[in-house]
């Protein structure tokens, strides 16, 4: 049998932490370990059609993948053209036309839970992670049900975020973050300006030649198919309080608070309360599910229904990513 549903008693997959509501992720196993995914493509698609929009995520395990190109074909088999990583916020390496490395932050850094590109008005509906090499220690890709996060956020905070929305401010380059050339995949300023105008991003070229952008985006969103409300933003990640205190103080002393690589405010420009951000981080932590990767695993997520992150790790680790099905708030 292809699909191996999670244990209904505690909703846990082997080492998946118990005590979290809902069967996330749903697990789909190869009938015979090592079978090529191509031999079961139709069954794989049926598993996704039946389960992705209810559980939010599917872990495909024990299927054989030859390389990143084979993974790209797997992601394409669900019927959507794969997306490029436009308006990037983190460093990645492009492996082929539509497959990227996962965020290349140092191994000692945690990447907090987030929905891909929820800092913008455009995002992918589907995202796939393929584990090519497991880290000897750590390196999990934690996930969390964004519907459950929405429900657990204090109603007053949730309403305030929803009403005011969020303004993301980014300062590119100067060796502190991605250059504008990296973020927009171009050396042409006019192309950057065209992209910004099309996507409702305010921009300014600073005296040092670097770029600053501002964009007002959603804090919550309604899934276009299921109609469910989800917590859908990266305020906790972009806010300056997400930086370690020593680094934060050093950055501010050098470039001023207005010049830090990234920050976020309410949509009207007013500051977000630190207590609200700590509450959001606490809810995300309490809702997080984590499981050890196995080499060859593919995790498929509905990007609106499920957030993802990255744990610290030791040793070599390789996880690659593909995205599909563009969605927009405008």
Identify the function of each model-found stretch.
Residues 1-39, 53, 107-113, 122-298, ...:
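Active-site environment of non-heme Fe oxygenases that use a 2-His-1-carboxylate facial triad
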Residues 79-93, 317-330:
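C-terminal end-helix/capping segment
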Residues 51-57:
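Short, surface-exposed connector motifs at secondary-structure boundaries
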Residues 40-48:
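Short, acidic/polar
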Residues 83-115:
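A gly/proline- and charged-residue-enriched helix-loop-helix capping module
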Residues 65-80:
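Glycine-rich loop at the start of a catalytic domain that most often binds anionic cofactors/ligands
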């Amino acid at each position: 049998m292809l699909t191996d549903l999670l244990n209904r008693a505690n909703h846990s997959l082997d080492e998946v932490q118990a005590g979290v509501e809902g069967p996330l992720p749903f697990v789909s196993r190869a009938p015979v370990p090592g079978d090529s995914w191509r031999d079961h493509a139709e069954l794989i698609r049926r598993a996704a059609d039946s389960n992705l929009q209810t559980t939010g995520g599917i872990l495909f395990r024990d299927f054989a993948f030859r390389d990143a190109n084979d993974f790209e074909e797997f992601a394409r088999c669900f019927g959507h053209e794969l997306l490029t990583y436009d308006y990037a916020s983190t460093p990645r390496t492009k492996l082929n036309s539509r497959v990227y490395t996962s965020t290349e932050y140092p191994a000692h850094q945690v990447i907090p839970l987030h929905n891909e590109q929820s800092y913008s008005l455009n995002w992918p509906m589907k995202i796939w992670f393929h584990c090519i090499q497991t880290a000897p220690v750590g390196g999990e890709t934690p996930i969390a049900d964004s519907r459950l996060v929405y429900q657990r956020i204090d109603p007053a905070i949730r309403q305030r975020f929803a009403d005011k929305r969020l303004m993301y401010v980014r300062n590119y380059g100067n060796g502190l973050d991605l250059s504008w050339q990296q973020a927009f995949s171009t050396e042409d300023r006019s192309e950057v300006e065209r992209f910004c105008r099309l996507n409702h991003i305010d921009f300014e070229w600073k005296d040092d030649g670097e770029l600053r952008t501002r964009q007002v985006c959603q804090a919550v969103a309604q899934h276009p198919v299921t109609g469910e409300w989800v917590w859908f933003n990266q305020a906790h990640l972009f806010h300056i309080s997400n930086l370690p205190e020593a680094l934060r103080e050093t950055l501010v002393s050098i470039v001023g608070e207005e010049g830090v690589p990234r920050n976020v405010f309410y949509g009207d420009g007013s500051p977000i309360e630190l207590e609200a951000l700590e509450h959001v981080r606490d809810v995300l932590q309490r809702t997080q599910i984590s499981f050890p990767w196995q080499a060859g695993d593919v995790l498929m997520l509905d990007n609106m229904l499920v957030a993802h992150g990255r744990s610290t790790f030791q040793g070599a680790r390789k996880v690659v990513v593909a995205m599909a099905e563009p969605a927009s708030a405008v």
